[in-house]
Amino acid sequence: RCRICVPQSCPRDCFLREDCRYQQYLRDSMKPDIQICNHNYLLADASHRLEDRPLLLRSYQALVVDEAHKLPDAARQMYTETLSPHNMDELCLLLQQAHYKDFARQMRTAFLTLSFSCTQGLSKLRGKASEPFVLTPFRRAALIDCIALLQNAGGLPDVPRYLLNRLGEAESLLRLFLLEVPTRILYIDYDIDGQPTFCAASSRVPQLLRSALWNTREPAILTSGTLAAAGDFSHTEQLLGLAAYRPLRHFRADSPFNYKKKCLLYFPPRVKTRMDNRKMAEEIVRLVDACHGHALVLFTSYRQMAEVRALTDGQWQYPTYQAWRNGGRVIQQFKESGNGVLFAAGSCWEGIDFPGDMVSLLIIAKLPFPIPDPVSDYERRQYPNLRDYINAEIIPEMQKKLRQGFGRAIRTEQDSCVVAILDERAGIGGKYHDAALAALPACPTTEKIEDVQQFIREQKRPDYFL
C-alpha cells in the first residue's frame, strides 16, 4: 500500500471511495477469468483467505507461479513483521491528529528511548547492517514502557478503528521481542543512518507456504529457469514447503542453445596468492582487450564493484558504465553503445536481456554465495555442523544464483559468449570447482587467454571488431 500512496487502512465512510482508483481496482479484480499478480500479492490474498478476510483475488481453480525460485524470498518478506522509526513516527502523528497530543508526546519519548537502547555501540557498523536481537536490561525496560503505552492507547475513547488496529499490531510485535518467542527470528535492521527497525521473521516459512497455497488442493504449476540446483529440485521443494507432497511431477526442458559450440568457460590460471581487487582488475583488463569490449562484469558487492571499476579506469578505449541500484538508464546506454563495458550488481544477475553481441564477454567476479544475516544464522543452528549446512543450504543457493548470472550470456540461438569466473574457489582445482560446473551447462573450459582470443575470432563477424 505504501508504494502506491494508499493509506494503511481506508475508512469505509471516505467520501472519495466510489471514485478511488485503488478501490475500483479491488472491485475490478473480482471480475476477470485470468488474474495476474506478483508473488507478494498472491501471498497476501492467501493470508486473507486463511483469516476469512475479504479476498484480493477471485477464487481460482488453477495456480501458475512463474519465476517460482523467488517465492521463498517473497514469503520471507511477507511473513516478517517490522516496526521502523517511520512506523513509530506515524503512530505518534495519528494519535496527535486524533487529539491526543500529550499521549502522542509520551509515546514518542518511549519510542526514542527504545531506539536509543538499540543504537549503543554502533560505531563498528558500516552502512546497512542486521544484528540478532539481544534482550538487555535497558531494552527490556524500554520495551515494557512502549508496550504499556500502546496498550493504554488502545483503551482511549474515540480512537479510529484503523488506528486501534495499528496500535495493536505494534504492541503484538514488541511483545515478541520482550518474550523472545522461539518461533520467531528476532533481529534489528539498521539503515544507512544507524536507525533501527525491529524485525520478527517466521522460522516456519515452508509450513506457512504449505498452509497458504498447497493445502488448498488446487493444481499448481511452478516454473523457473533455476528451480533446480545442479539438476536437483529437493532444495527448492524444502524451501517451498513441498517436500512432504507426493507425487510431485518434475519436468526439465533442455536448453535450445548449443553451449558446447557457442560458449567458452574461462578460469584464471591457478596461483598460490589470493586474488585481490588489483589482480582482479588486471584480469578484467586482459579479458576485455581479448574480447574487444562487449562485456558485462557482475559483482556480488557494490563496494567491490566501485573499487575494481576505479582500478580499471583508463585501461581501455571502450565506453564504460557502472550500474547502481535502479540503474535502468545506464543499462540502456550500455545496450546502445555497441561495444561497451558494464559493471553491475544486484538486479543485473537476472531478468535483464542482453541479446546479440552486446554481451560477448560475461565476467563473474565472485561466486554468488548468499550474504549471512540473522535468518541464515538461525538456519545454520538447525544443522549438526557447518559442513552439513553449507552442503544443504549455501551451495544450492549459490548454484541457482550462478545459473541466473550465467543466463545473461546467451539469449538467442545465434549468440556466442565467453564466460569468465574469476573466483579462485571456482577455478580448476578450487574448493567449489565441481559445484560451479554442476550448476552450468556443459561447455568447453580453458585457463588460457589465447583460447579466449581465438574463440572470439572464430565466432564473431568482421563488423564486431570495428
Describe the function of each predicted region:
Residues 1-466:
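ASCE RecA-like P-loop NTPase motor cores
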